[in-house]
Regions:
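Hydrophobic alpha-helical transmembrane segments
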Residues: 1-72, 80, 84-87, 96-121
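Short basic (Lys/Arg) and small-residue
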Residues: 91
């Protein structure tokens, strides 16, 4: 199979459309994006190290990706199950739980990185 650059660009375009379709419409994603701006701003102000930036960016990416997966799962469940069903609710809860695990882990990592900077003030 030959590589098709135009097809690759279209694929990236579809991915961006997917992300943008959630921004401003999903409350939890909006919360995580606001937290991202705050964390990145704090990183610049406090002058965190390259290694710390690497960990912070990885945490941000994991949480945002988890939130996007959660949104996709919720929409798919809504499409497949038009009426309330206990398993559909459980699937949504499990997906939301995965986001919570990622977000809590990221918050703890953030505290580990940022607290030493504030204790020196």
């Amino acid at each position: 199979m030959q590589y098709d650059f135009k097809k690759q660009l279209r694929s990236f375009g579809y991915a961006w459309q997917g992300i943008l379709s959630c921004v401003g419409k999903e409350q939890n994603l909006s919360f995580h994006l606001i937290a991202t701006v705050i964390v990145i701003s704090a990183g610049f102000v406090l002058g965190i190290t390259r290694a710390e930036w690497t960990v912070i960016i990885l945490c941000i990416g994991i949480v945002i990706a988890a939130e996007l997966f959660n949104t996709a799962i919720e929409k798919l469940v809504d499409l497949v199950s038009l009426e309330r069903h206990p398993i559909a609710g459980q699937v949504k809860d499990i997906a939301a739980g995965a986001v919570l695990v990622c977000a809590v882990a990221a918050a703890i990592i953030g505290l580990i990185i940022f607290i030493p900077y504030f204790s020196g003030l």
